[in-house]
């Protein structure tokens, strides 16, 4: 799904240790009251569900301070539909905790351009299987977003928009997938209850890595439109 870099050596991470020292200096030494308060608990107003992609760091992008964001990151920033029963529901568990215990006011689903997960979905739609143990099942949730544009006829040939055209314009599916995740959020009963009561706001965002542009969802139907 991504190209390998430096296959014959492990890349150095010592600069991260230096960054921790800088973080400690910036927050613990200059603003000890804030960190003392955070050591006793958190009360972020926003849950953000973002992609694991290294190029879209939510804290950096939003300029957030410690304690401002409750963050979930997964492949392709997907929200699975609500379901009960056995299983490891990592994303659902984080959403439940953020909504029912932390009581966030906002949920942002943040998609982005050049998403590897969506690229894999488009490849699968074109007949190329995703040869990964866990990724294939996970990103299959985004197939509905693809099928908005790829409409099979009776012979099974996709004809509404070609796969090749979508591969050239993956932002269409990336944004549709964000909209799909917003609708999936409303299948969680405690999300819908607070949303219907006006106590929780849902937002869909899509960030263009190349240009820095931001698209945001319409309040009525969750479709994304250019904003910044």
Where are these regions (language model features)?
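Gly/Ser/Thr-rich loops at beta-strand to alpha-helix junctions
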Residues: 53-55, 112-117
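Conserved H-X4-D acyltransferase segment
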Residues: 42-59
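Catalytic core of membrane glycerolipid acyltransferases/transacylases, capturing the structured
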Residues: 55-78
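Short beta-strand segments
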Residues: 49-51, 73, 110-112, 203-208
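Divalent-metal-activated hydrolytic enzyme cores
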Residues: 2-44, 77-105, 116-228
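Structural motif
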Residues: 45-48, 68-70, 105-108
